[in-house]
Amino acid sequence: MKILITGSAGMIGSYVVKELIAKGHTIVGLDRRESDWKHENFIQVALDLADKKALNDVFENENVDRCIHLAALAHFAGENDLSFERFKFVNVTCAENVFEACALHSVPVLFISTVDAIGMVKGVITPETELNPISNYGKSKAMAEGRLKEICQKWNIYRFSPVYTKTQKRDIEKRYYLKYPNWAYKIGSGEKFEVLEIGGAVKSMVDWVDKEVDNSIHIIKDAELLDVNTLIQREKAEGRAKHVLWLPRWMVVCGYYCIRAVFGKSNKTYLVFKALWPFRTIEG
């Protein structure tokens, strides 16, 4: 197959490109910058997804079979503008351009969303759980999910748990570090979190290429929970986490409700909410 991947030069995208090429597929990679990695079956196109004409030209010229839409504004490193308008432009408006091109050319699309689109929800979560996003990232991804359903005839949505590699843990470290690499923390007896190792994320997308596109939503996560106690012990063994602050759960819960009384449902309260009531998801 010839598969179009947006965000092909990003952390996740670069892994997916290599794995799909190893499976014998041809990849059309769209990104604002070209990857340093080259292959005869890797067609790189440097463009901005806001450029509708350039985007549609790629679809016209390359005759792709499927699309994986990975490109997004997610993590904050190096970003100066974190307004909702910026998130909406990148994650909704640019996504709409991709979805419209897919619909025009009858290309099935896999949209990579996030569990942050679910938001502040307690209890067991399924793909059918009503969304209550709080963060700008989660709100924009939830909006994009809605637009995908309206625009495209054939689609799937994969809501990824936080993705990590051995060397890049991104926002996972927030769950056990106050200040990396020396000051760790744990709440109560230590929480367990749903996360997603890069290999599992890549496998889910590679497998999708050979599956029937059935307009369904799936939550993608590791089979095992991330145990904060085990993780801190591992960090200490490697010379990090020299100090571990233990926070009684009751104290953090009280703090959460005090913060919420002042700020309501906001990014500040959402971060504490996720630490106290980690997601527990099932396929439904």
Give the label of every model feature segment:
Residues 40-51:
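Rossmann-fold cofactor-recognition segment
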Residues 49-90, 101-104:
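NAD(P)H-binding glycine-rich loop region in Rossmannoid oxidoreductase-like domains
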Residues 50, 66, 86-97, 135, ...:
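Glycine-rich NAD(P)-binding loop of the Rossmann-fold in SDR/ketoreductase-type enzymes
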Residues 3-23:
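N-terminal Rossmann NAD(P)H-binding glycine-rich loop of SDR-like oxidoreductase domains
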Residues 204-266:
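Mid/C-terminal beta-alpha module of Rossmann-like enzyme folds, strongest
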Residues 154-200, 207:
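NAD(P)-dependent short-chain dehydrogenase/reductase
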Residues 96-136:
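Conserved Rossmann-fold NAD(P)-dependent oxidoreductase catalytic core, especially the SDR/UDP-sugar
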Residues 120, 132-156:
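Active-site Tyr-X1-5-Lys
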